[in-house]
Amino acid sequence: MLQTYKDQLPDYAKDLKLNLTQVLSESPSSELSNQQITGVALAVAYATRNRQLIELIFQKAEAELDESTLQAIKAAASIMAMNNIYYRFVHLVKDSEYQRLPANLRMNIIANPGIDKKDFELYSLAVSAINGCGLCIDAHANTLIKAGFSKHSIQHVIRIAAVLNGLAQVSIIENKT
């Protein structure tokens, strides 16, 4: 299915097509496993809200990931959709008093995602990149560095997000949302 999708991309999306192949593969400079790459891709697909990408990546993920991981990816995409809006506001608003106010938003899934917390952080970083929350990006990237991930691995997550976001744009242009 992935090859069929790539074959149907328009000529103007050739760079994205080639980049997709590259970012969905394991890299010697990144310690991300195939399962982590697929999980990040699915979290990003959910964050783009693009039905075509969601269906495409879900089909790959369903074959590679267990049910608890699939549920955690949905949780990461959903909780980050909430947190990224809230914390982007806190980060961007000029009144610093908002930074001192308690969020008063339930987000227990972050502490207990039902999978390895490092994987949940990878998914959260990817979704935060799509949603443009600088404060969240910094927090997740720093957590991953402290957990032992290299900057190349973090960059790999962001490259996956960037390429899939570009492909979501192609879907919109081609009316395939």
From Swiss-Prot:
Cystines in this chain: 133-136
EC number(s) per entry: 1.11.1.28
GO biological processes: cell redox homeostasis; response to oxidative stress
Keyword list, A-Z: Antioxidant, Disulfide bond, Oxidoreductase, Peroxidase, Redox-active center
Any GO MF annotation of the entry: hydroperoxide reductase activity
Active site: 133 (proton donor), 136 (cysteine sulfenic acid (-soh) intermediate)
Catalytic activity entry: N(6)-[(R)-dihydrolipoyl]-L-lysyl-[lipoyl-carrier protein] + a hydroperoxide = N(6)-[(R)-lipoyl]-L-lysyl-[lipoyl-carrier protein] + an alcohol + H2O
Protein family according to the UniProt entry: Belongs to the AhpD family.
Task performed by this protein: Antioxidant protein with alkyl hydroperoxidase activity. Required for the reduction of the AhpC active site cysteine residues and for the regeneration of the AhpC enzyme activity.
Protein's UniProt name: Alkyl hydroperoxide reductase AhpD
Lineage: Bacteria, Pseudomonadati, Pseudomonadota, Gammaproteobacteria, Legionellales
